[in-house]
Amino acid sequence: MIKKLFIILCLTLFATNSFSAGSDPKPAKVKTDYAKAVESIKWAKKYEAKGKLEKAKKRYAKAQKLLLKSNSKKPNQADTLNYLGFTTRKLGDYENGEKYYLQGLAIEPNHIGINEYLGELYVATNRLDLAKERLKILENCNCEEYKELKQIIDGTKKSKY
């Protein structure tokens, strides 16, 4: 009797294990070029805050390449154009950074990030009148971006980025 119970128990265990061994695992999620770029930008900002500017620059360049790929696969996305403007500006190309920001604003005129970053670009290129126009758009958003841009325009704060 004990022998029969033992055999039944063993067969049950083996049957259970064989089913679990054959089950398919869930496929791993593949990160988009955009998601990889955003991650690279986060790292670049951390490096920049620590004064590791060469590492930051490499991360911005990597992010820019990923964003260009993302933009070619899925064009006219305001968030992608915002980050393209940002990385291009961070790499010192203000002219093309501005073009990306303006393309993004053509799609989404009240985009908070684009308006703030474009305002910062205008301050950096001594075009305060245009920076104030961006500030005016952010005026009613009740957001941190408005406060930061205002302080940067007023000269009471230096741009973090």
Please annotate each region the language model reported.
Residues 23-31, 43, 132-161:
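Terminal, low-structured helical/coil segments at or just beyond the last alpha-helical repeat
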